[in-house]
């Protein structure tokens, strides 16, 4: 009880920050990507130059799902031009945005795989802080009032030991000053890892989510957070479930996105 009080009390949190800074000076933590020194003022495991050098997603993509366009002339001719996927099957979410390209070149995909399968929850939290840094620029100010991570099945959570989406979502909610809800959206069944075509992925997650606390969602502008947007099947199904429970709108934010 005493330790918990000390950790939750403002003085306890301040002491923890000072202790962490002192430990960093004595035993500096290297960047998980390059091994270089980290800024002790930032609670991160990825240095600024490495983050800046990752394959970033810039402006110039589908205004709905954020899919990058190879030819910038597409948006120049029609700023509201939606990609073929969004025109063929309009998504239930308002917009989706991501920070990194999910590909081997540049390190985006290896970074995500290391976070998910390398037993590195600290890396997920650090990347969540980087996502929080960019949330306003990518999503707009005041666009959500509740953050919900895509849940794992109980079996997958036991195997991995953590839900990377929840660890990414925590810093985003904290920076925005809104609640993080990790209990309302839940998996109704374990699903195999997402592979194959868009249709196969959609079938794999159809009906895989449910709301445990619908009243918590009703009327809220929800930010749905996940690690990777590939075809969008998982976040589409999650968004449908949230909207069926009465969410006012759903915005999607992922660490990475497949081209």
Model-inferred region functions:
Residues 1-226, 230-259:
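Glycine-rich phosphate/pyrophosphate-handling loop used in enzymes and phosphotransfer proteins
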């Amino acid at each position: 009880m005493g330790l918990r009080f000390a950790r939750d009390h403002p003085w306890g949190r301040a002491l923890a920050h000072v202790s962490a800074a002192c430990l960093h000076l004595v035993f500096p933590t290297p960047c998980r990507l390059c091994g270089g020194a980290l800024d002790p003022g930032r609670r991160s495991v990825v240095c600024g130059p490495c983050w800046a050098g990752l394959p970033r997603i810039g402006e110039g993509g589908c205004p709905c799902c954020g899919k990058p366009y190879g030819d910038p002339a597409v948006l120049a001719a029609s700023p509201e031009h939606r990609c073929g996927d969004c025109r063929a099957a309009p998504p239930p979410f308002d917009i989706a945005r991501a920070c990194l390209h999910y590909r081997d070149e540049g390190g985006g995909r290896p970074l995500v795989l290391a976070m998910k399968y390398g037993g590195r929850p600290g890396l997920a939290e650090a990347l969540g802080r980087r996502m929080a840094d960019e949330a306003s620029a990518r999503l707009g100010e005041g666009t959500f009032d509740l953050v919900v991570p895509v849940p794992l099945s109980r079996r997958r959570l036991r195997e991995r030991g953590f839900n990377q989406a929840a660890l990414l979502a925590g810093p985003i909610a904290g920076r925005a000053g809104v609640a993080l809800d990790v209990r309302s959206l839940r998996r109704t069944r374990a699903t195999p890892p997402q592979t194959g075509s868009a249709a196969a992925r959609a079938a794999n997650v159809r009906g895989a989510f449910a709301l445990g606390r619908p009243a918590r969602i009703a009327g809220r502008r929800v930010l749905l957070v996940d690690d990777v947007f590939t075809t969008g099947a998982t976040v589409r199904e999650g968004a449908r479930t949230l909207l069926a429970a009465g969410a006012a709108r759903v915005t999607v934010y992922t660490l990475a996105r497949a081209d």
